[in-house]
Amino acid sequence: MTKVQYKHTEIAVKKKLGQNFLTDRNTIRKIVQSAEIQPGDHVVEIGPGFGALTSAILEVCPSFTAVEKDRKLADFIREEYPSVNLVESDILEVDFAKLAEEGPVKVMGNIPYSITSPILFKLLENRSHIISETLMMQHEVALRLAANPGTKEYGILAVQLQTFCDVRYLFKVGKKVFRPRPEVDSAVVRIVPKKTPLDDCETEFRRFVRLAFQQRRKTLQNNLKQHYDISQLSASELQRRAESFTITEFEMLFSRIRPLQ
């Protein structure tokens, strides 16, 4: 069992919580700068751990909220950083409307590899309460999130997130700056929610995207014909694969199909 100790607190690292603690001050500084936070901003940090990012945020924002699931780490943050509003909870269960009672929030954090996608979709569903997200995640996931059409990384995650948010890959973070050292590299991504006409039909659009990509090597026609009336789509569109369509094209396709009854 791997253990990590900092000051007076020692924890047994929980793989299921994705506990890899950032130690490099330069990387921490770059993350805070990338988040573009200002004094008075409402900041929410996901998984503060031993407070490496927490202390850097406090240099800009004298008070903010952090969400930590691990009880020992939550106690550590309360003791070391009393000005931080510590919410001891699973981020997937947090009420973002409550976190944003005083105004929309800027989300930051080194998010666990094991639940990256659920966290991203939790944030997506609560984007009306969010100004921006500056997140460190597994490098491979970051590439998928910011991928362009026609690449092997481009898929459901990219289309669903990029439709409702502006997504930017910022920089890579090597595994050597963590304790314990993970098996893969990380990267920092910035996500900014945007207004779109699809806000009112998000659930059905996301279902459409999942079905379009359900078998990547099949054509759009083969993936959709059992689920939608696709008679308004052209023959050339139907013979293309989902990975070839841009975000704008996906939006146009969605406006011209109808679910089969």
From Swiss-Prot:
EC number: 2.1.1.182
InterPro entries, alphabetized: KsgA/Erm, rRNA_Ade_diMease-like_C, rRNA_Ade_Mease_Trfase_CS, rRNA_Ade_methylase_Trfase_N, rRNA_adenine_dimethylase, SAM-dependent_MTases_sf
Record: residues binding S-adenosyl-L-methionine: N20, L22, G47, E68, D90, N110
EC class (word): transferase
Gene3D superfamilies (alphabetical): Ribosomal RNA adenine dimethylase-like, domain 2 (1.10.8.100), Vaccinia Virus protein VP39 (3.40.50.150)
Domain of life: Bacteria
SUPFAM superfamilies (alphabetical): S-adenosyl-L-methionine-dependent methyltransferases (SSF53335)
Subcellular location: Cytoplasm
Annotated function: Specifically dimethylates two adjacent adenosines (A1518 and A1519) in the loop of a conserved hairpin near the 3'-end of 16S rRNA in the 30S particle. May play a critical role in biogenesis of 30S subunits.
Protein family according to the UniProt entry: Belongs to the class I-like SAM-binding methyltransferase superfamily. rRNA adenine N(6)-methyltransferase family. RsmA subfamily.
Annotated protein name in UniProt: Ribosomal RNA small subunit methyltransferase A
Source organism of the structure: Prosthecochloris aestuarii (strain DSM 271 / SK 413)
